[in-house]
Amino acid sequence: TLKEGPIVYQENEYQFRCDNPLTDTTNGPKYIALGCSRTYGIGVGESDTWSNILQSKMQNRTPKQPIKIFNMGVPGGSCETSYRILKNWIDIIRPRAVFLFTPPGWRREIIKENKIELVCEGHPLANKLKSVSSSESDDNHKDYMVKAMGHCCALYKAKLFVLDNGSTVRVDVGNDGVHPGPLSHKLFAKNFYSYWKREFKPRK
């Protein structure tokens, strides 16, 4: 990937790396991809993000039915970020399922009036937050948020598929030398695809 040159990050009006859900005309099942920079795809081209690879695999499985996955990953986002986005968009998109690649459990959001701060690596509160927390507490918080997203999905009869960032392996790096590269994204997509295929049993 490092030899392929600069990556262009094309975003819609809401700063998501996908088409605008409000103007999309896909006449088929729609899905939402949630997570942090590993979902957004920092360091890889749009075609190499796991959500794009997953969409292609799903489309090949059901070629007669158009499929759309909206990549709503937010760099530096937390599980709280994913929940907020899901809560605000699920009624609009009405997804068949939601794919969640969990962000690190220690991250948080601070919402004050119309301002949202993402407490992640590099934030002034990051080290303090880490010092007063523990891996057990972070895991519990992440579990609470995933359950909240599951409840949100259940209200709209959508399935929730979860891939935990702590249980995945990064086999390569992207252009930035830090985030997962194309091969890693293929593995993420493969995992989500197996969940989707097992649940919906699609036929060609």
Predicted regions and their residues:
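N-terminal secretory targeting modules
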Residues: T1-I32, I92-R96, F101-E136, K142, ...
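Serine-esterase "nucleophile elbow" of acetyl-processing enzymes
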Residues: Q10-P75, E80, N88
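Short, contiguous strand/loop micro-motifs
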Residues: G41, E136-S137
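A general structural detector for well-ordered alpha-helical segments in enzyme core domains, enriched
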Residues: W50, I85, M145-M149
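Short, hydrophobic alpha-helix immediately C-terminal to the catalytic nucleophile
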Residues: N52, Y83, K186-K190
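Structural alpha-beta junctions
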Residues: Q59-P66, H151-F161
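Short, well-structured alpha-helical segments in soluble
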Residues: Y83-R94
